[in-house]
Amino acid sequence: MRQISMQEAAARLKSGGLLLYPTETFFGIGCRVSDDDAIARVFQVKRRLFAMPLPVILADAGQLPLVAQVAPALAEDVARLERAFWPGPLSLILPARMHISPLLTGGTGTIAVRVSPHPVPCELATLVGEPIVASSANISGHPAVTRAEALDAELVQAVGAVLDTGPEPTGGEPSTLVEPLGNGRLHVRRSGAVHNDRLRAAGFEPESGIA
């Protein structure tokens, strides 16, 4: 398993490569969000269905306009969510910018974004100057892992490089996925590390099961 430095990892992403790297929960596999060929390779090496969207990690909230559009009616709620939960394991589902690959959105026209509390993906996104893809580093259907040594050998060989630095992922629940609906209402698309009681405590009204 070839482990590389942060600078090497950023250069690899800039040149169109894939990377295995730690996040706050599990190891992830990623590339630049603007690299359609690399995004397609993420699906291939994970054996992931193309209809399944890929989440994205931002360096900070300032990168949000690079990938997502926030309607004026949602702007206040999105800003409140950013202040209350970023950095943290809360992904916002928002309309994607027109230039964003449909592979990232799964054809839905929306994209899931978060600012990770783990320093590695945020520094990578800073160094490459754009958000990065952040899918779990596993073959689809296999368990996600928290240690580099536990990464699937086939995946490591296909990707070719591992950045193993910073805090070890803690495992546990994945990020919570929410879609802002306006007026403080949130459609909870996936329950996770940020529970409904925390959303309510921040002044939001979480809802599930919306068609």
Across the structure, where does each feature detected by a protein language model lie?
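Active-site-adjacent structural elements in enzyme catalytic cores
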Residues: M1-A211
